[in-house]
Curated annotation (Swiss-Prot):
Protein name per Swiss-Prot or TrEMBL: UPF0260 protein Rleg2_0895
Homology family: Belongs to the UPF0260 family.
Species assigned in the record: Rhizobium leguminosarum bv. trifolii (strain WSM2304)
Pfam family, any one: CxxCxxCC
Classification of source organism: Bacteria, Pseudomonadati, Pseudomonadota, Alphaproteobacteria, Hyphomicrobiales
UniProt xrefs under HAMAP family: UPF0260
InterPro entries the record matches: Puta_zinc/iron-chelating_dom, UCP006173
Amino acid sequence: MNDLPFWKRKTLAEMTVAEWESLCDGCGLCCLNKIEEWDSGDIYFTSVSCKLLDGESCRCSSYENRWDFVPDCVQLTKENVPDIAWLPPTCGYRLVNEGRDLYWWHPLISGDPETVHAAGISARGRTINENEIDIDDLEDYVVDWPLTVGEEKDEEEEEA
């Protein structure tokens, strides 16, 4: 019997629905509004969250019905994950797709869904809901932390 966890022995395409869903660490970073520069294609994260993101749990408040409220919500699928450039570098789907392991704080590793928040990886406490701003001011909310979360712990592990 193979003792490797499913994310180390299966491709995204081979995963069951339950395995697929469990790859989400609950960070909420994919639910942040992003700005794409037309000329360069560069993508910038903002601290402005989707109106459905629960800022405390970092989960969608209406996951099953999200398209009723946010028609352009991007559903991550086994087919599109390889092509989505804006997935944060710590995203479980991205990591597994790239053949990398999950981080120590991922709930599948830690056994606790709170470690993603305790480690400072998630959007918890860092966002403003899109309903609370003038969308024309979105560029005033550009942040880099979704691209740098986790770096400090990684550096500490490398030094150890």
